[in-house]
Amino acid sequence: MSETRAVLRGVRLSVDKGRLVADLIRGKKVDQALNILAFTQKKAAVIVKKVLESAIANAEHNDGADIDDLKVKTIFVEQGTTLKRFTARAKGRGNRISKPTCHIYVTVGN
């Protein structure tokens, strides 16, 4: 069977926080990975779980894959654009606030 991908771009999440969760499920079987993500208490876990479920649905619908045989082949989190915002400070000054985004790529296969 070929590999099937799912991509989520522009997620309002830091790359480092996303990679912490991605490292937990890399190389695992999909049912085990979903179980790990369900019990991981991080914002990134909810987002990565949605992308993984999308990749599983893509594999089942597009390739006719059996879910029991699938495992997470690759998962990586790359840096997206950074939203730059302004916050007011004392004496008429201002400081920049950086709001990072990331892109999440998940590939499942046998």
Curated annotation (Swiss-Prot):
GO biological process: translation
SUPFAM superfamilies reported for this sequence: Ribosomal protein L22
Pfam families: Ribosomal_L22 (PF00237)
Keyword field contains Signal: no
Gene3D superfamilies in alphabetical order: Ribosomal protein L22/L17
Superkingdom field: Bacteria
Keywords: Ribonucleoprotein, Ribosomal protein, RNA-binding, rRNA-binding
CDD domains noted in UniProt: Ribosomal_L22
One Gene Ontology cellular component annotation held by this UniProt entry: cytosolic large ribosomal subunit
GO molecular function, one term: rRNA binding
Known partners and oligomeric status: Part of the 50S ribosomal subunit.
Protein role: This protein binds specifically to 23S rRNA; its binding is stimulated by other ribosomal proteins, e.g. L4, L17, and L20. It is important during the early stages of 50S assembly. It makes multiple contacts with different domains of the 23S rRNA in the assembled 50S subunit and ribosome. The globular domain of the protein is located near the polypeptide exit tunnel on the outside of the subunit, while an extended beta-hairpin is found that lines the wall of the exit tunnel in the center of the 70S ribosome.
Family: Belongs to the universal ribosomal protein uL22 family.
NCBIfam families, A to Z: rplV_bact
Name of protein: Large ribosomal subunit protein uL22
Classification lineage: Bacteria, Pseudomonadati, Pseudomonadota, Betaproteobacteria, Burkholderiales
